[in-house]
């Protein structure tokens, strides 16, 4: 909505937590009023899903430990960060996204809350690369990211490109939205003809130069 760009991510999340609290209170109210036994599983299932959301996703119980291995400047307001797994890596595919929490470093403030980022590269050894543009409070802090920072990663999620090569296609991207397509192109030759239309500003020309090389 029109208000979304004006809300800090932390405040936006707290608003959603208030909604979750309202749902929990509503379920508790139904239990107090009394439910038929065969309907009792409905609020119980909802509470279990809410607990999984809190513990598994928001608190990172399902997250894997990574470390920032390299950071590359991509124009005036973007970076690419390569992350190396400390245990097992994610079984990710191009077109997917992950939830990432960046912790503090010697000269880096950190963004300990989990934020979504689309993968811009996926390596066979478990390393993943994220394209990060300064669009909000956390992503602005991440422009100062440095190697060695501890990271927690959840996912991967999504099936954006799973059926993209079943027939010839047209891919359209703008700015940092190129990352899922770039992740696929970095894997090697496509299996079907695809036309890519990429709209970008001069500050994002670093990706355009690489795309020219991949298309050659």
Region roles according to the model:
Residues 58-152, 193-195, 199-202, 212:
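Ferredoxin-reductase
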Residues 1-61, 129, 134-216:
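FNR/FR-type flavoprotein reductase catalytic core
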């Amino acid at each position: 909505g029109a208000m979304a760009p004006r809300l800090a991510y932390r405040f936006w999340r707290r608003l959603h937590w208030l909604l979750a609290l309202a749902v929990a209170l509503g379920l508790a109210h139904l239990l107090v009023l009394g439910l038929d036994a065969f309907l009792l599983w409905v609020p119980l299932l909802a509470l279990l899903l809410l607990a999984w959301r809190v513990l598994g996703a928001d608190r990172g119980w399902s997250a894997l430990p990574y470390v920032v291995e390299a950071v590359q400047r991509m124009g005036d307001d973007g970076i690419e960060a390569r992350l190396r797994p400390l245990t097992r890596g994610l079984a990710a595919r191009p077109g997917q996204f992950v939830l990432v929490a960046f912790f503090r470093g010697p000269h880096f403030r950190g963004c300990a809350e989990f934020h979504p980022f689309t993968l811009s590269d996926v390596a066979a050894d478990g390393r993943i690369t994220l394209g990060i543009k300064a669009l909000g409070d956390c992503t602005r802090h991440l422009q100062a990211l440095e190697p060695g920072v501890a990271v927690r990663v959840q996912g991967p999620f999504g099936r954006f490109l799973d059926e993209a090569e079943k027939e010839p296609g047209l891919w359209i991207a703008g700015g940092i939205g190129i990352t899922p397509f770039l992740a696929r192109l970095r894997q090697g030759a496509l299996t079907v003809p695809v036309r890519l239309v990429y709209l970008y500003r001069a500050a994002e020309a670093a990706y355009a130069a690489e795309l020219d090389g991949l298309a050659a």
